[in-house]
């Protein structure tokens, strides 16, 4: 809840910065999937379809260190970013994560985890086009 409130407070500044970052062509795409092995296996068709629709774009995947091996030989991923959840806990960790995303200068960010801090990190990381799976806190995800 704290991260949502913080996002509302700084969103005018972030929207202004996003206005200056928008580009017409898509060069870099980030997919965040830091869940378990089964979730990553089920989301590999997403990588294929994105690469099919954006063949010239560089596709990066942000995954756990335990699931990195599943994507190492995947022809649809150009870069694999390995993260540890312990390194990104707390406000400092979330700011470090958004800084990592900002340095990547991604045009599209897709968060496949129903995890609010990762979805907000795309906004804090100044990704112009953001897609995310959001939980509704009643046990269902939409």
PLM region descriptions:
Residues 1-142:
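Catalytic machinery of carbohydrate-active enzymes
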